[in-house]
């Protein structure tokens, strides 16, 4: 995949004339992953359940990038290269990030601590970033570039919904 730095925003629409259809492509869902690998996704017999369990473990470890499905590409190297490309070419270029190393540290922290609450102040202190707002901006950039989904905690109580955000990695 290449960089999509110029395509990240709705601003692109102002450069287009006529009609357009926005299509967002994400990595395969687990259901799609199973279909591609000919794994029964509804069967309840022992073999189907076992194969699905094995496929789920593999999916959680390797992700759902179509490019890595046939085994021809080293999954770890591919994922690292993709992350580097998005950070350097998409985020840093588009948002004119002055401290790319700090952005990378924030990205690594969000990725390493996925599904956990993001504590912006702790990240700021850990990496000696000047302000909490800078950390929030970096996390927002990760969200905009589709590296992570940043969501409010689910709760029936509005006070709990306003607490720290959680990150979910798109892989």
Model-derived regions, located:
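Interdomain motor-coupling "hinge/lid" segment immediately C-terminal to the ATP-binding subdomain
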Residues: 5, 9-117
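Accessory nucleic acid-recognition modules appended to NTPase machines
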Residues: 73-171
């Amino acid at each position: 995949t290449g960089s999509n730095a110029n395509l990240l925003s709705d601003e692109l629409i102002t450069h287009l004339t006529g009609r357009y259809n926005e299509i967002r492509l994400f990595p395969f869902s687990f259901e799609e992953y199973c279909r591609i690998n000919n794994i029964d996704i509804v069967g309840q017999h022992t073999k189907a359940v076992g194969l699905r369990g094995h496929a789920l473990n593999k999916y959680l470890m390797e992700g759902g990038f179509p490019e890595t499905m046939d085994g021809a590409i080293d999954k770890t190297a591919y994922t690292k290269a993709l992350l580097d490309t998005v950070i350097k070419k998409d985020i840093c270029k588009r948002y004119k990030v002055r401290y790319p190393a700090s952005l990378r540290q924030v990205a690594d922290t969000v990725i390493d601590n996925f599904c956990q609450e993001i504590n912006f102040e702790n990240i700021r202190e850990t990496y000696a970033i000047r302000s909490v707002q800078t950390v929030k901006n970096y996390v927002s950039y990760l969200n905009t570039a589709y590296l992570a989904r940043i969501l409010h905690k689910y709760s029936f109580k509005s006070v709990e919904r306003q607490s720290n955000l959680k990150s979910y990695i798109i892989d």
